[in-house]
Amino acid sequence: MRTIRKVGRETAELTDEELRYIDTRVVESVKPVLVGRRLFPVFNVGHAGFTTVMGYKQTDMSQAIIDMYGITQSRDRVELASFPIKVPVLHKEYKIYWRDLIASRNGGLPIETMNVENAARQVAEEEDKLLITGEYTGWPALGIEGLAIATGRNTKASAGAWPANAITDVAAAIGENETDGHYGPFALILRSSWLAKLRALIANTGIFYLEKVAELVKAGIYVSDSLYTSAGAVTNALVVELSQENFELVIGQDLSTFNQQDEDMNINGKVYEVVAPRIKRPTSICEITGLT
């Protein structure tokens, strides 16, 4: 009689090497998607237990004093208006089938990670919408505000007819932020369809509109199709001053994976993170509205 073969050895929990490979593929798959992370400085709260953090809207002190002996008192304080910010879990589940795992282990091939990578991209896309836009009509996000819908942000109506008026629009948005004491460097955030218009040549020159706009926004031009208006339209762009003093990404748990074998011998997995945008000085943001 043959010895009964041990069932489950080839379909056991993922090895350390397989887990490292999965994590590597997750990181590589989200890099092109995470535009917001290039804009937001990070504030790490240390663990995923925080469900809320406090945000603070601040006002400036009174102006400094000029005198001969420095004895006139001008002491006051920055006024801070506090408000709670929810820190949600962004997650997407996936499955690795046991037969695919056997094929990988016996065929000398890397583990199949298409489902894992797709799940990671879904999480990254949600993160980018959360940071760059926040909750908008048609996309519920626990009322969390990103750059495009931040209460107290500046707005400037577009002169329309892009790319002809793109330079004028961006310059006007910078002016709005400068009026509130923000002097750059500024970045421009826009959707790919509006960037395409900037690749046109200015009449009677060999210069692209994109080149002239780039001269105004020294912190760079960032392209993200996660940018929407509060109503869910795609007719806006943002000019922002990059600084942790203005806004930051709160991280309780950075992008991670969790894997567990089920009763059917398959691996159930989850890509997840615990993050939220915290907008401190919304006057560092100007939304250009009504692009045409």
Predicted regions and their residues:
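Long, hydrophobic/aromatic-enriched structural stretches that serve as scaffold segments
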Residues: 37-108
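Extended, solvent-exposed, turn-rich assembly/linker loops in the middle of proteins
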Residues: 142-211
